């Protein structure tokens, strides 16, 4: 199962169509001075840009800057309405997920996205999120989360406010590997998405 997730992520990154960088493993906080790497295949069902939806992928590297903050660098590719994209995310987990309480955090994200009409789009978003992990059978742990990314998108000298709702979960299969499943739905001038992926942490 894990090999299938990894192969799907690699193939979609090499031969991708339209996609949008999602929440993915932001709530799965990386410890101080540790790191994680993940592949995020994604289907985009609709966009407010010309070109419609498609299928693509993002690769993301996360590093634990402090005991309460992470830095993530992402790069992706696609066809349809969106092509190459690159950006970064700074996340602050101000209430850790511990026994008896949910985890709360916020992430600030900036991405440059090359569109297939030869123009470009720049996004600046905030990602408030809440998550809570719990054990299931055979030592596996689910870490479901809800996030509401919102912010500004700049394109061709204009800007607009955007907002999306996101529901997803990480599945901890062992100490190092996480599987990810996520759906996002348009609230205001954004995309509806479905993604799955895999990440590895040291």
Predicted regions and their residues:
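Short, acidic/polar
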Residues: 55-58
């Amino acid at each position: 199962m894990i090999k299938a997730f990894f192969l799907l992520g690699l193939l979609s990154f090499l031969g991708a169509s339209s996609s949008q960088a999602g929440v993915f493993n932001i709530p799965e906080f990386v410890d101080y001075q540790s790191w994680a790497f993940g592949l995020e295949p994604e289907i985009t069902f609709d966009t407010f840009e010309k070109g419609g939806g498609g299928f693509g992928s993002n690769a993301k590297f996360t590093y634990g800057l402090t005991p309460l903050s992470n830095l993530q660098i992402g790069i992706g590719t696609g066809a349809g309405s969106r092509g190459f994209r690159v950006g970064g995310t700074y996340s602050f987990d101000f209430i850790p997920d511990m026994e008896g309480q949910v985890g709360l955090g916020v992430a600030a994200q900036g991405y440059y996205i090359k569109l297939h009409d030869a123009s470009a789009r720049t996004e600046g978003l905030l990602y408030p999120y809440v998550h809570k992990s719990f054990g299931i059978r055979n030592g596996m742990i689910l870490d479901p989360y809800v996030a509401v990314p919102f912010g500004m998108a700049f394109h061709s000298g204009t800007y607009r406010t955007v907002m999306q709702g996101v529901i997803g979960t990480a599945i901890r299969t062992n100490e190092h590997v996480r599987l990810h499943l996520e759906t996002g739905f348009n609230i205001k001038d954004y995309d509806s998405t479905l993604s799955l992926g895999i990440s590895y942490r040291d």
